[in-house]
C-alpha cells in the first residue's frame, strides 16, 4: 500500500472525506499532521479556522485521496456545524487517554455526528496519547466496551510516536472503499438488468449499510 505523501500528479479514483472530532487538546491537529505529512510538533497551537489536508494512498490497486478535516477549534465554542459533517464518509472520534472528561464527552460527540452525518458513516474511536501511559485516566476496556456497544472501530494511538495512526486511517478508508465498491458492483448489476444505476460514474462519498468490527482491530496496543 503506497504512502502517497506529497504526490499531486497521480490519477485519483476516489476521494473520501473523513472528519476529526472530539474535545480541544486531545491531539486532533497532531493526528492530522502525522497522517497527512508525517510531522509532529509539541508546540502546535490550537487550530483556528477551517483546515483540511489530503493524502493519497493505494487501496486494492486504486488511487484513493483521503481528505481529512479538522474541527479547527470550533469545538471550544460548541460551534461545529452541519456543514463540517456534510459529505463525510468517515470519522475519527478522538479522546485523550490521560483526561477522563474527554472520554466522557464522546457520547455527545457521537450523537452530534450521527445527527448531522450519513447514518452509515464509518467511525473509528481513537484513544490518543498512549505515549503518556503513566498518566492514563481511561482504561482501555472502558473504551473497548463503548466501541463494541456502538458498533465503532477502536484503536489507541500516539501522534507523537506515530503509533497505530496508519492502522486507524487505513482501517476506515479500506472499509469505506469496500462499501463504495459493493455499491458500484450493485449498480452495474442493475444496469445490466435494464434498471437505472444511480451510482454510475460516481465513485465518491457514498457509504453503505453498517460496519462490522474486525476482531484484529477491536483491540488496542499502546
Swiss-Prot record:
A motif (Effector region) lies at residues 44-52. Keywords: Cell membrane, GTP-binding, Lipoprotein, Membrane, Nucleotide-binding, Prenylation. One of its GO terms (molecular function) is GTP binding. It is a lipid-anchor. It is found in: Cell membrane. GTP binds at residues 22-29, 70-74, 128-131. The keyword Membrane applies. GO terms for cellular component: endosome; Golgi apparatus; plasma membrane. A lipid is attached at residues 219-220 (S-geranylgeranyl cysteine). InterPro entries: P-loop_NTPase (IPR027417), Rab_GTPases_membrane_traffic (IPR050209), Small_GTP-bd (IPR005225), Small_GTPase (IPR001806). CDD domains: Rab11_like. The keyword Nucleotide-binding applies. PANTHER family: DRAB11-RELATED. Belongs to the small GTPase superfamily. Rab family. This is Ras-related protein Rab11D. It comes from Nicotiana tabacum (Common tobacco). The gene is RAB11D.
Amino acid at each position: 500500500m503506497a504512502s502517497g505523501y506529497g504526490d499531486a500528479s497521480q490519477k485519483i479514483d476516489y476521494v473520501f472525506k473523513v472528519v476529526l472530532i472530539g474535545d480541544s487538546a486531545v491531539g486532533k491537529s497532531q493526528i492530522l499532521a502525522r497522517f497527512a505529512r508525517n510531522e509532529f510538533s509539541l508546540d502546535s497551537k490550537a487550530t483556528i479556522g477551517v483546515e483540511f489536508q489530503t493524502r493519497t494512498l493505494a487501496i486494492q490497486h486504486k488511487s484513493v485521496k483521503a481528505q481529512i478535516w479538522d474541527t479547527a477549534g470550533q469545538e471550544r465554542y460548541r460551534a461545529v456545524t452541519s456543514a463540517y459533517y456534510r459529505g463525510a464518509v468517515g470519522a475519527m472520534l478522538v479522546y485523550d487517554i490521560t483526561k477522563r472528561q474527554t472520554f466522557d464527552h464522546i457520547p455527545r460527540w457521537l450523537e452530534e455526528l450521527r445527527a448531522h452525518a450519513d447514518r452509515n458513516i464509518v467511525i473509528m474511536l481513537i484513544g490518543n496519547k498512549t505515549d503518556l501511559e503513566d498518566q492514563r485516566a481511561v482504561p482501555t476496556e472502558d473504551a473497548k466496551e463503548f466501541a463494541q456497544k456502538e458498533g465503532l472501530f477502536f484503536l489507541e494511538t500516539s501522534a507523537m510516536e506515530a503509533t497505530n495512526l496508519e492502522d486507524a486511517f487505513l482501517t476506515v478508508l479500506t472499509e469505506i472503499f469496500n462499501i463504495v465498491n459493493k455499491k458500484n458492483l450493485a449498480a452495474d448489476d442493475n444496469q445490466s438488468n435494464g434498471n437505472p444505476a444511480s451510482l454510475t460514474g460516481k465513485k465518491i462519498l457514498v457509504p453503505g449499510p453498517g460496519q462490522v468490527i474486525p476482531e484484529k482491530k477491536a483491540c488496542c496496543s499502546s
